[in-house]
Curated annotation (Swiss-Prot):
UniProt-annotated binding residues for FAD: G15, G16, G17, H18, A19, G20
This protein's name: tRNA uridine 5-carboxymethylaminomethyl modification enzyme MnmG
Cellular compartment(s): Cytoplasm
Recorded family membership: Belongs to the MnmG family.
Primary gene name: mnmG
Source species of the chain: Brucella suis (strain ATCC 23445 / NCTC 10510)
């Protein structure tokens, strides 16, 4: 790293968390000479808070990261110690794969992948400043004075950007417990004209599992047949563990109420807004004080680690109050506190400052991913990191960006939400955020996104081969089941109750019936028994949703047409007669590039959209649709 040549890269990624690792890996896979700048190599891939990956909505993101040949799914499969498929009894569209992860195994697995990745160099050091050539990023200055030159930068600072930890009345600068914050970068971002805000998150105390009375607790087991995240994982081999379940008590609540004035959250010390769906225990007691207790999951942090994460009691109360609280919780009366819970505040940038490529609008070549964009969660961060890293590599190479639409992926939904609506609190993914969740299922992420990954050059040969093998098997099974048919009368002999309308139905059609699966059809057509279990499940889900998917495709087509209807860059919003001054101002500030994007501007009504479309036609005549996409303009 001593020569000038060694200090030049195509892409520099700042931060070695979940967003940074995915960004660095994606950029390197895309062929960019990539540097991952982090304070210390041994902190790459650290799970800062909850030792779990996936869940409702989040599991979909992990599957999509994996479909794009990212790291998180494979790493979680190696490190997972309690796999559970959430919403198993509900439809496949809302099922959420989740695993509790061994912190050490997770960190070591991702560090190994980073080390083995071609085109990727880890640079230990702190990023002190961003270097620009006019309005274009050109490098990064490190705290020790080194200057790294580049064509694009991905900033993934997590909670480190002006991070401030709160434990009761105490507060001190930190990125997370025991690590220095990133100072100075906020001032540089402000100098670029970005709008910064403060957000907050928190974490519970860590406990010594040897001092917990496990015998008095209910226990939750892992699934008997763990469902992996990654297409590349044949089966889970890591030992699976149980978690304990306990609850807070009225005595717990009394202690919290009596000490609310000492909580950083309620004393006025914290300015940042916390995540709505991960409230502190103080919030739970204040907002849901009528409940007798709140559930706590006691999650071991590793196979050879006695540390336990009590999921459900995130707090910023003083350490002495935290100790008193533990004494009132069944099973934790004698628990030893290894690390107090705390809240942490950090800077973020209004994500409306970003294009959908995750490149900033103000500085060419500067990309942002993760909590700096106002999101919360490893999965949200990793998904943004992958997209930002890929597009940073493409920016450095002079190629057009990759834009994921809302109709294509949960990643597209998230990025569109962030860049068009912004955030008033930390954003997390739910299946309910997607209009087309029947087609955006966790089980079909590979079908939706792996061909794209192959097209843009970030897919490994091994994954391509495995994907094509699976798709060939599914295509063959589909063809076979569509070629086999039966009359309603004959179906009755096999105890299949169909409308007696005389219409023959294929085996594929029959799989759409709620009480019919492949096992029942094998009695009629024994040759179906040769379909392997993985293909069988995929076929059953596909057939189950086939009718609904046909209906949804028309809705998707409407949205895609709106995504392609471009707003000319020179359109004068002030000239649109009938549009309110408020909307004119918002449109000028937001600068939407398509009608679909304009529709998501706060306050836009159907009448306002009609006025905008009329002005577009007056401005430039008939707009090109499919031929002139966002990518073609390079606007995103």
């Amino acid at each position: 790293m001593s020569s000038a040549e060694a200090l030049a890269f195509d892409v520099i990624v700042i931060g070695g968390g979940h967003a940074g690792c995915e960004a660095a890996s994606a950029a390197a896979r895309a062929g960019a000479r990539t540097a991952l700048v982090t304070h210390r190599f041994d902190t790459i891939g650290v799970i800062s808070c909850n030792p779990a990956i996936g869940g409702l909505g989040k599991g979909h993101l992990v599957r999509e990261i994996d479909a794009l040949d990212g790291l998180m799914g494979r790493v979680a499969d190696r490190a997972g110690i309690q796999f559970r498929l959430l919403n198993r009894r509900k439809g496949p569209a809302v099922r959420g794969p989740r695993t509790q992860a061994d912190r050490k195994l997770y960190r070591l697995a991702i560090q190994q992948m980073i080390t083995e990745q071609e085109n990727l160099t880890v640079v230990e050091g702190g990023a002190a400043d961003l270097v620009c050539d006019g309005e274009r990023i050109s490098g990064v200055t490190l705290a020790d004075g080194r200057v790294l030159k580049c064509g694009a930068v991905v900033l993934t600072t997590g909670t480190f950007l002006n991070g401030l930890i709160h434990i009761g009345e105490k507060r001190f600068p930190a990125g997370r417990m025991g690590e220095k914050p990133a100072l100075g970068l906020s001032e540089r971002l402000l100098s670029f004209g970005f709008t910064l805000g403060r957000l907050k998150t928190g974490t519970p105390p860590r406990l010594d599992g040897r001092t917990i009375d496990w015998q008095s607790l209910d226990m939750q087991s892992a699934d008997e047949e763990p469902v992996p995240f990654s297409l590349m994982t044949d089966r889970i081999t890591t030992p699976q563990i149980e978690c304990g379940i306990t609850r807070t008590t009225p005595e717990t609540h009394d202690i919290i109420r009596a000490n609310l004035h000492r909580s950083a959250m309620y004393s006025g010390s914290i300015e940042g807004i916390g995540p709505r769906y991960c409230p502190s225990v103080e919030d739970k007691i204040v907002k849901f004080g009528d409940r007798d207790g709140h559930q706590i999951f006691l999650e071991p942090e590793g196979l050879d680690d006695d540390t336990v994460y009590p999921n459900g009691i995130s707090t910023s109360l003083p350490e002495d109050v935290q100790l008193e609280i533990l004494k009132t919780i069944p099973g934790l009366e004698k628990a030893v506190l290894l690390q107090p819970g705390y809240a942490i505040e950090y800077d973020f940038i209004d994500p409306r400052e970003l294009k959908r490529s995750l490149e900033t609008r103000k500085v060419c070549g500067l990309f942002l991913a993760g909590q700096i964009n106002g999101t919360t969660g490893y999965e949200e961060a990793g998904a943004q990191g992958l997209l930002a890293g890929l597009n940073a590599a493409r920016r450095a190479a002079g190629s057009e960006p990759v834009i994921l639409q809302r109709t294509e992926a949960y990643i597209g939904v998230m990025v569109d939400d962030l860049t068009s609506r912004g955030v008033s609190e930390p954003y997390r993914m739910f299946t309910s955020r997607a209009e087309f969740r029947l087609s955006l299922r966790a089980d079909n992420a590979d079908q939706r996104l792996t061909p794209l990954a192959d097209e843009v050059g970030i897919l490994s040969k091994e994954r391509r081969k495995r994907y094509l093998t699976r798709e060939t098997a599914l295509s063959h099974a589909r063809m076979v089941t569509q070629s086999l048919s039966i009359t309603p009368n004959l179906a009755g002999y096999y105890d299949l109750r169909l409308n007696q309308d005389g219409v023959r139905r294929s085996a594929y059609d029959l799989l759409s019936y709620p009480d019919i699966n492949l096992d029942r059809l094998i009695a009629i057509w024994p040759e179906l028994a040769s379909i392997d279990p993985v293909t069988r499940e995929a076929l059953e889900i596909e057939a189950q949703y086939a009718v609904y998917m046909e209906r949804q495709q028309s809705d998707i087509a409407v949205m895609e047409r709106e995504e392609r209807l471009l707003i000319p860059s020179g359109l004068d919003f002030d000239a649109i007669s009938g549009l309110s001054n408020e909307l004119k101002q918002k449109l000028k500030q937001r600068k939407p590039e398509t009608i679909a994007e304009a529709q998501r501007v706060d306050g836009m009504t159907p009448a306002a959209v009609a006025l905008l479309i009329a002005q577009i036609r007056k401005f430039g005549g008939r707009q090109k649709l499919a031929a002139e996409t966002l990518e073609g303009k390079g606007a995103a």
